[in-house]
């Protein structure tokens, strides 16, 4: 489920019912655009990975872990019971796991309850800019250039995928 549904945007901005189809299309476009900039989907998804333990830790490929479903030691086929999760880093308490390959099954993304307010604000502002640009194009205005303002870009940079 989308962590920031169109219905919430509709309520916040009090959008006109006569323009709902266009607004929903622009909102979907805005979400896809932001996900492309960030490098990951906003919506919570399930991921499966194989990672090798180095220095008693492994790194997930995804940010914003919402649930660690399972960690299996592929060497012993046993569940790894104790770990500490900090961002994309999983610290393992059992030193015997060093060098082992682990199967990670986890959920990552944003939920409605965990969606950051500043990211929601950036989505709203970008939606309004896209709508303004769309109206200009409909009116055949010459100035239809689109550029993300610095304040929105700064917010998106906070959440942009960082490589390890």
Feature map (PLM): residue ranges:
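Divalent metal-cofactor coordination and adjacent catalytic microenvironments
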Residues: 1-164
């Amino acid at each position: 489920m989308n962590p920031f549904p169109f219905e919430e945007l509709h309520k916040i901005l009090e959008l006109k019912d006569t323009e709902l189809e266009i607004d929903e299309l622009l909102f979907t476009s805005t979400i896809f655009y932001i996900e492309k900039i960030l490098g990951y989907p906003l919506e919570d998804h399930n991921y499966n990975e194989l990672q090798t333990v180095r220095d008693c830790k492994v790194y997930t490929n995804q940010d914003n872990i919402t649930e660690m479903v399972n960690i299996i030691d592929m060497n012993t086929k046993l569940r790894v019971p104790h770990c500490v999760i900090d961002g994309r880093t999983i610290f393992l308490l059992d030193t015997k796991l060093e060098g082992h390959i682990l199967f990670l099954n986890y959920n990552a993304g944003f939920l409605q309850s965990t969606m950051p307010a500043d990211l929601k604000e950036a989505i709203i502002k970008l939606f309004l800019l896209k709508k303004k640009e769309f109206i200009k194009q409909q009116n055949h205005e010459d100035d239809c250039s689109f550029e993300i303002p610095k304040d929105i870009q700064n917010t998106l940079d906070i959440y942009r995928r960082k490589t390890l």
